[in-house]
């Protein structure tokens, strides 16, 4: 789990954070860029399971799926307790179940350094994915 968490933070955290900072809802566009959809994405309850679906991915590539937030300028904090790895199918698609939290203990960096508490009712949070090569996307999530 620690190895998966470290990979998630080192690769996906940055990817998810950058994607989240640029645009919270990134459907796949016509040139095949990765797109992600989170269902449901609004009015969530703490501990609820959402479905993260993505298209436009590199087939056979492992993607790290998780919940993150920008915790400081240029710093992404993620919930390492629920991150998971999923391999894109031959069509470049994935579907994963992800438990999300309205508040979580964020970790940052490849070593999973504790950062502190993230309250997704106060700051913007996202669910998304990223690969070791930095390919990924994210969508904003909100809690009731």
From Swiss-Prot:
Keyword terms, alphabetized: Antibiotic, Antimicrobial, Disulfide bond, DNA-binding, Signal
* Any one of the GO BP annotations: defense response to bacterium
What are the protein's GO molecular function terms?
A: DNA binding
The disulfide bonds in this chain are: 68-78, 120-125
Q: Name one Pfam family in it.
A: Neocarzinostat
Signal peptide residues on this chain, from the entry's feature table: 1-32
User: What is stated as this protein's family in its record?
Assistant: Belongs to the neocarzinostatin family.
Q: What does this protein do?
A: Binds non-covalently to a chromophore which is the cytotoxic and mutagenic component of the antibiotic. The chromophore binds to DNA as a weak intercalator and causes single- and double-strand breaks.
Q: What is this protein called?
A: Macromomycin
Q: Which organism is it from?
A: Streptomyces macromomyceticus
- Taxonomic lineage: Bacteria, Bacillati, Actinomycetota, Actinomycetes, Kitasatosporales
């Amino acid at each position: 789990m620690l190895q998966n968490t470290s990979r998630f933070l080192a690769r996906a955290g940055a990817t998810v954070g950058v994607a989240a900072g640029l645009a919270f809802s990134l459907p796949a566009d016509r040139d095949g860029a990765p797109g992600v959809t989170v269902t449901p994405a609004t009015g969530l309850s703490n501990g609820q399971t959402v479905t993260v679906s993505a298209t436009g991915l590199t087939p056979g590539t492992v993607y790290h799926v998780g919940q993150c937030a920008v915790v400081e300028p240029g710093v992404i904090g993620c919930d390492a307790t629920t991150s998971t790895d999923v391999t894109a199918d031959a069509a470049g698609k994935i579907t994963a179940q992800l438990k999300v939290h309205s508040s979580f203990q964020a970790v940052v960096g490849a070593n999973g350094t504790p950062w502190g508490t993230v309250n997704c009712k106060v700051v913007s949070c996202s669910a998304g994915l990223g690969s070791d090569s930095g390919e990924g996307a994210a969508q904003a999530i909100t809690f009731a």
